[in-house]
């Protein structure tokens, strides 16, 4: 899935017709914020984390500095992800974080108010859309256009959305997974589910706590998933792959090191992976037969950071008998799709939602 192709060639209407130098594409994710700048490409990739003082709510750090505090802060400091499962959990902190990142990307000379194309989960409500638009307006954005996350991911991995042909994209973020069937630039069937990166991490935390009475943090669980996680039962040699894990003994309260094997992490992830595959199957069952036939021929594309789980395409193929592959750079698929719309907004006007329906400025 290399290369970039156009979507439906819809003439611009003035609002969309010409990109400006400081126009941006934004992937505001649960775990990371990525920004694409017109004419420059990907200019920012930072953790969506804010560290605050617990009593005063004073912001102490944002992005990388805040991420380093996760699980390591004293009791008076909290490291918070202001977005949960793809939606805004803390309006004020999301605003502060976005303004910080925008100021870092745009020079003061250019910051006359950019226009922004932002991705949103396919199941997001009008109220949640309006919250995002208000946050961007408060952060200094001139105008916001929303792009369904599956469409952004499809553009980013190089799908030609002009075709009267069924394609399936499964975009796996930290908080949410968007499953969508796309044809002629429109989402025909979709589902947003929580079987995503954080859900996998939580399953690892629970498994290790139950089996070893060992408490580990979310960052440790993520590293375990990256290093030895697998969606398929490991072969003999692979099953013996192990890594030392440091946690806190639930009984004594003292630090302890435990060796964890790949076979154990497969057991921890077996049910979450099965639930994800079941959700993909549910979308396929609701898909019109001709489009489903196209997908059986052409396969499923995985994007998003959580798509990096080892042997996940193989697990999907084994269960559904449909070819499955991962985008070349799954973490950037969505923001690159937003960037494509930013570079040629007139051609993608039919995909963009200006969010005006029932919108009220807060």
Describe each model-derived feature in a short phrase.
Residues 1-172, 180-300, 307-362:
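Nucleotide/phosphate-binding catalytic cleft detector across ATP-hydrolyzing
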């Amino acid at each position: 899935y290399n290369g970039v192709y156009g979507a439906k060639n819809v003439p611009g209407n003035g609002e969309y017709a010409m990109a400006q130098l400081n126009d941006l594409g934004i992937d505001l994710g649960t775990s990371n914020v990525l920004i694409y700048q017109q004419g420059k490409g990907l200019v920012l990739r930072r953790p969506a984390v804010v560290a605050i003082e617990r009593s005063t709510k004073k912001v102490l750090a944002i992005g990388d500095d805040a991420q380093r505090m996760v699980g390591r802060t004293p009791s008076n400091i909290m490291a918070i992800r202001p977005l949960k499962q793809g939606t805004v959990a803390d309006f004020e902190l999301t605003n502060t974080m976005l303004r910080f990142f925008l100021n870092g990307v745009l020079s003061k000379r250019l910051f006359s108010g950019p226009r922004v194309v932002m991705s949103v989960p396919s199941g997001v409500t009008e109220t949640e859309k309006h919250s995002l638009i208000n946050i961007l307006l408060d952060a200094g954005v001139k105008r916001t256009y929303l792009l369904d996350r599956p469409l952004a991911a499809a553009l980013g991995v190089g799908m030609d959305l002009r075709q009267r042909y069924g394609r399936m994209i499964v975009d796996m973020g930290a908080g949410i997974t968007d499953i969508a069937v796309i044809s002629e630039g429109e989402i025909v069937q979709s589902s947003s589910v929580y079987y995503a990166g954080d859900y996998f991490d939580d399953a690892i935390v629970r498994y290790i706590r139950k089996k070893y009475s060992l408490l580990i943090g979310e960052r440790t669980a993520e590293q375990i998933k990256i290093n030895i996680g697998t969606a398929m039962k490991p072969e003999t040699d692979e099953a013996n792959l192990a890594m030392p894990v440091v946690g806190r003994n639930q009984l004594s309260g003292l630090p302890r090191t435990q060796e964890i094997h790949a076979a154990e992490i497969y057991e921890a992830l077996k049910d979450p992976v099965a639930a994800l595959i079941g959700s993909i199957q549910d979308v396929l069952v609701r898909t019109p037969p001709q489009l489903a036939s196209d997908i059986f021929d052409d396969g499923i594309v995985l994007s998003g950071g959580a798509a990096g789980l080892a042997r996940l395409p193989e697990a999907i193929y084994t269960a559904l008998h449909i070819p499955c592959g991962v985008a070349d750079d799954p973490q950037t698929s969505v923001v690159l799709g937003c960037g494509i719309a930013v570079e040629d907004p007139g051609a993608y006007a039919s995909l963009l939602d200006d969010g005006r329906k029932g919108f009220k400025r807060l």
